[in-house]
């Protein structure tokens, strides 16, 4: 029989663990909710307001001219993005309902791989027309900079998916009875 001091410490430790679990679960739910909100905002903006991705020029008479930076190829990429965003929203809703470590990690890996596919397709299709920028140097540099940035994002996402996968495997190996 543990002494009263040890028993109190064990009970206090148990409460701290429960508090921590409750906070982290609440934090994850907040994160899932923020992800859902952000994905819905992106879905709406990039589906219905893409024409505002443009170069704006103020004319001498005070009027504003909007020159689109997107080509018609944007509409070849848009279904890929919309599909990914809808999958992400659905996955985050599912993770709010069912929140287990292994499940969460698998879903995050899948979503990250989907992100790599979306970014890789964006680089491949490259639906941008930077010729509307009035600076010749910027017109030459911007496509290169955007391509490099998107490749870095895709590689970063890929590394993130690989790290999550390795952590998941290590966690599962530690839990399996030997």
Predicted regions and their residues:
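Alpha-helical membrane-embedded segments
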Residues: 147-164
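Canonical alpha-helical transmembrane segments of integral membrane proteins
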Residues: 34-50, 86, 115-118
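Cytosolic juxtamembrane helix at the C-terminal end of the final transmembrane segment
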Residues: 2, 159-178
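Loop-to-transmembrane helix junctions at the membrane interface
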Residues: 88-119
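Membrane-helix interface motif
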Residues: 44-63, 120-133
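N-terminal juxtamembrane cytosolic/stromal segments of multi-pass membrane proteins
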Residues: 1-37
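Short, membrane-exposed interhelical loops at transmembrane-helix boundaries
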Residues: 132-147
């Amino acid at each position: 029989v543990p002494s009263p001091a040890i028993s109190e410490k064990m009970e206090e430790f148990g409460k701290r663990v429960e508090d921590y679990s409750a906070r982290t679960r609440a934090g994850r739910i907040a994160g899932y909710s923020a992800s859902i909100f952000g994905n819905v905002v992106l879905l709406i903006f990039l589906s219905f307001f893409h024409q505002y991705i443009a170069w704006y020029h103020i004319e001498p008479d005070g009027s504003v001219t909007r020159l689109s930076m997107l080509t018609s190829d944007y509409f070849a990429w848009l279904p890929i993005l919309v599909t990914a965003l809808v999958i992400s929203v659905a996955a985050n809703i599912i993770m709010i309902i069912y929140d287990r470590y292994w499940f969460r990690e698998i879903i995050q890996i899948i979503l990250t791989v989907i992100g790599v596919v979306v970014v890789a397709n964006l680089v491949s299709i490259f639906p941008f027309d930077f010729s509307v920028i009035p600076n010749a140097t910027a017109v030459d540099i911007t496509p290169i900079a955007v391509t490099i940035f998107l490749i870095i994002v895709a590689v970063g996402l890929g590394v993130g998916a690989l790290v999550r996968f390795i952590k998941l495997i290590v966690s599962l190996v530690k839990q399996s009875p030997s």
